[in-house]
């Protein structure tokens, strides 16, 4: 997918780029698959900010996606490729012979007119087909992977993401995640074949502050620009550095400090992700 750039006729246009939308074939969405989501803008039920730098952003409707892929053994045809404002991947509208319509994540290479099918048993290994991990050959790349059977896909759902099946052990399948983490997933879990499309999304340059405001992202104020009462880095005459290691406003170390709590599922992780040296 091509990235469109602009001539620098304003300073904000100079570095701005957008994805080419020629792959989008639909002019409107299916009404029955749209719903409203309440925008919390980072506030809790008391109206207090619990997650900073968030706002409502542009108005948008949520597209109901079929993450479970539980319409088994019925072949559907891709009727349209659509834009989804709530995710960086494109979505595909699948129409089934009984008239049922569902949205799925569009894997790379899936186009209008192609057929997709989901089954609990084995299927041909084609892009967009969904089946249980135990029926997918070792070495295949998959996306939209369940963590618990029947719960719906939770892993590898962003643009350009995929996991690779590395092997099997007892009732588990070994997956190499997009982060390079190796972990066990129950072989009864469903997954879709292929890589999530729209791979060039990572190369888009936002270019100006207004685009982030439309996305619901507010500006971030540096701690060193605050007063001592507001941040551990605040205060000082003129521009001053931080004393000691950088920390969050609440004193948690900001660079490489582990904050992940232990979980029961930690035993399913074979090896953690590899950190880049830089």
Swiss-Prot record:
**PROSITE patterns linked:** RIBOSOMAL_L2
- A single BP term in Gene Ontology: cytoplasmic translation
The entry lists its GO molecular-function terms as:
rRNA binding; structural constituent of ribosome; transferase activity
Family (UniProt): Belongs to the universal ribosomal protein uL2 family.
Q: Which HAMAP family match?
A: Ribosomal_uL2_B
Function comment: One of the primary rRNA binding proteins. Required for association of the 30S and 50S subunits to form the 70S ribosome, for tRNA binding and peptide bond formation. It has been suggested to have peptidyltransferase activity; this is somewhat controversial. Makes several contacts with the 16S rRNA in the 70S ribosome.
**Name assigned to this protein:** Large ribosomal subunit protein uL2
Annotated organism of origin? Helicobacter pylori (strain Shi470)
Give the encoding gene's name: rplB
């Amino acid at each position: 997918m091509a990235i469109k750039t602009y001539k620098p006729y304003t300073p904000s246009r100079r570095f701005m780029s957008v994805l080419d939308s020629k792959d989008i074939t639909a002019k409107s969405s299916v009404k029955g698959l749209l719903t409203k989501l309440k925008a919390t803008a980072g506030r809790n039920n008391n109206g207090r900010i619990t997650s900073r730098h968030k706002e409502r952003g542009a108005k948008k409707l949520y597209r109901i996606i079929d993450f479970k892929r539980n319409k088994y053994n019925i072949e559907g045809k891709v009727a349209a490729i659509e834009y989804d404002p709530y995710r960086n991947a494109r979505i595909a509208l699948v129409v089934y012979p009984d008239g049922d319509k569902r949205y799925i994540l569009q894997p790379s290479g899936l186009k209008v007119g192609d057929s997709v099918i989901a089954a609990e048993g084995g299927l041909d290994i084609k892009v967009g087909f969904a089946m249980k991990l135990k029926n997918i050959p070792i070495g295949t790349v998959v996306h939209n992977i369940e963590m618990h059977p029947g719960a719906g896909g939770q892993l590898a759902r962003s643009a350009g993401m995929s996991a690779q099946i590395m092997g099997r052990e007892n009732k588990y399948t070994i997956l190499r995640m997009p982060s390079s983490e190796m972990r066990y997933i129950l072989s009864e879990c469903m997954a879709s074949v292929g890589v999530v499309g729209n791979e060039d999304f990572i190369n888009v340059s936002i270019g100006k502050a207004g685009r982030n405001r439309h996305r619901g992202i507010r500006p971030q104020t540096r701690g060193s620009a605050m007063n001592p009462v507001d941040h551990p880095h605040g205060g000082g005459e003129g521009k001053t550095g931080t004393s000691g290691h950088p920390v969050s406003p609440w004193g948690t170390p900001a660079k490489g400090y582990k904050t992940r709590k232990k979980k029961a599922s930690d035993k399913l992780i074979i090896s953690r992700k590899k950190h880049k040296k830089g």
